[in-house]
Amino acid sequence: MSDTDAPADGGPAPAPTPPQPPPPGEAMGRDDGGEAPGTAQSVPPSGSSRTRRRWPYVLGGFVTLVVLAAVIAANISIPYYVITPGSASPVNQYIEVPQADNHAIKGNILLTDVLVSQLNALAYLRYRYLDSNNEIFSSQDLLGPSTSNSEFISQGYLQMAQAQSFATAAALTHLGYSVTSTDVGALVYGIVPGSPAAKTLKVAQVITAVNGAPTTSECGLIEALHRYAPGTKVTLSVEQSSINDVGAFVSGPVAQKPVTLAKAPEASVVDFCGGPPITQTAFVGIAAQTQQDWQFPVKVTVHTQNIGGPSAGLAMTLGIIDKLNGGRLTGGHVVAATGQIDQYGNITAVGGVAEKTIAVERAGATVFLVPLGDGNYDAAKSKASPQLHVYGVRTVDQALAILERLGGKVTTNPVPARAAS
């Protein structure tokens, strides 16, 4: 959850509350100041009666200190995150295809995620020493040097929005439909703290022009800003899009935002999108990527509330194909899938595969499709029982070929095309 948790495939969720020690009265067995059953032998036989009477209070004070220390530890956040098994649920419940929603689904394709949680001191000890089904990362390794927790969550939702578009494009293209897209701007993906952008822009907004000159892509933005020196005041046309309360990307109106360019911390040479390298001396302080507007011949809507990250791409692609294919893709099997996808149907590696394997087993999957590369296949095999058959794939075509061998059926152009609205 992209796909880095609120579930993530992504997004962070509150750390689980660790079990608390019992109150002092329970630990002693009695609360009347006398010796608890089974503790009398702990009192030295030669001790005075005063010593014997005070012993429960000494233990009570010790337990109180332990409880207090546990409470403090449970409320101190530390710069570590944990990835734990999340859920695995039928992907068809997230997908709407009005032209095909009357088809009965045979079997299930499961979308799986993980939970990404920031740790407190007590939870860190629990996951480090008492639970082997997790991965712990430092905030530096997971977020990077300058990404805040809230920005990390927003980036996960942006990855999911892109994954939905790519999954739809890959699915429809495989089924024989014609799919096109248009570059419409430079999406603000990250913001450098203390930069000019930090005062003016927000993650998920889209820059469409600089001083009135259109910037329809990341490359266009780089080229436009390259013309100006540090200290120059420019006006950015910014679509004020955002992430809503359920993690969905929402477009907004365009506003004009004045920004004074700063001197780049270090002059950097940029390979200008296939053109000659250019040296940047001024910067606005953002990480950007090209925002695309997709034209689909079939109306497909994907609702993945509060799930972030890119790794649901393969599952969503298969789910869309299954919807349009009459629900016959799995051959009646319960099939789980994870993997990042591009618009061409290529599948690349994701995180949390070991934890996802645990989640899909718990959900009853018998087949698990994972990316073949970067250790994903090995991670899944290391956690899978003999009842879960793991297959590594690099493309949607390979995934479909495996499902066909297992009894699934795929056709092309299964429903008449109708422009999405």
Range-by-range predicted roles:
Residues 1-55, 136-137, 146:
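Terminal targeting segments of Actinobacterial cell-envelope proteins
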Residues 310, 318, 323-326, 331, ...:
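Glycine- and Gly-Pro-enriched alpha-helical subdomains that act as flexible
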Residues 371-383:
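Short, glycine/polar-rich helix-capping loops at beta-to-alpha or helix-loop-helix junctions
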Residues 197-220, 239, 357, 361-370:
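Conserved PDZ fold ligand-binding element
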Residues 82-105, 109-116, 139-192, 265-337:
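PDZ/PDZ-like peptide-tail recognition elements
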Residues 223-280, 382-405, 412-420:
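PDZ-domain C-terminal substructure recognizer with occasional recognition of PDZ-binding tails
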